Amino acid sequence: IKERVEKTIKLVDLEEHSESNVQDLSGGQQQRVALARSLVMEPEMLILDEPFSALDAFTRAALQKDVRSIAKDLGINLVIVTHSIDEAVLMADRAVIMAGSPGQIEEEIVVSLPEERNAQDPEVQKIRGHLMETFRRVSTVEN
């Protein structure tokens, strides 16, 4: 178990904080601790609910990239719940737009982009636009 914990701490880049109390860490580091708690169990899938919402832009971008990389390296599938269309495009291989109560799938969109994604890339912007339009349409129907 100790070996697995040490490996996971290294994986989430918290080696220098391994003896720290969680409450003494920054928000981004606390998110890394939460990720490590899940990863140490060696899951096949992680479900993350708004995992980056409380982070500043720089920390969010770094953690998004790290989470994608870790998931790919370990062969873990991610299900990420987000209200951020930009985050969906940058993180997802598929984006699902849900609406209604109880939630129903309105549209599923394949996000066929390379691993390294740049928000300014025209293909990223095209998929973002499609998601925005779908979201507007669904929101209009609900109201």
Task: Name these PLM-found stretches.
Residues 60-74:
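Helical segment within the ABC ATPase nucleotide-binding domain
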Residues 26:
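ABC transporter NBD signature
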Residues 20-23, 41:
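Conserved signature/switch motifs of ABC ATPase nucleotide-binding domains
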